[in-house]
Amino acid sequence: MVNPGRTARALCLLCLALLLLGQDTHSRKLLLQEKHSHGVGNGTTTTQEPSRENGGSTGSNNNGQLQFDSAKWEEFHTDYIYTQDVKKP
């Protein structure tokens, strides 16, 4: 006999795995679009520095990985910390 609770848990885990795979695929697609657009926004929210192969400088760590504007990420982090402080003083 099939246990309904175990079946429901298995079904939920399967759906969660499919959603995570779909999200990963979507993220990779956005990164590829951003890489092919040579750092121009094209409506996406990532702010990348141009890669060395496109004539730009990626700093000291140039191993082919995408580099992001650290000032923008610091701003996001500061905004997040401020928001958390306001919510839970």
From Swiss-Prot:
Q: Where does the record place the region Disordered?
A: 33-70
What is the name of this protein? Phytosulfokines 1
Output the Gene Ontology cellular-component terms. extracellular region
Gene designation: PSK1
Q: In which tissues is it expressed?
A: Expressed throughout the seedling. More abundant in fragments containing shoot or root apexes where cells proliferate vigorously.
- Biological processes annotated in GO: cell differentiation
Tell me the compartments it is located in. Secreted
Keyword Ligase applies: no
UniProt PTM: Sulfation is important for activity and for the binding to a putative membrane receptor.
What organism does the UniProt record list as the source? Oryza sativa subsp. japonica (Rice)
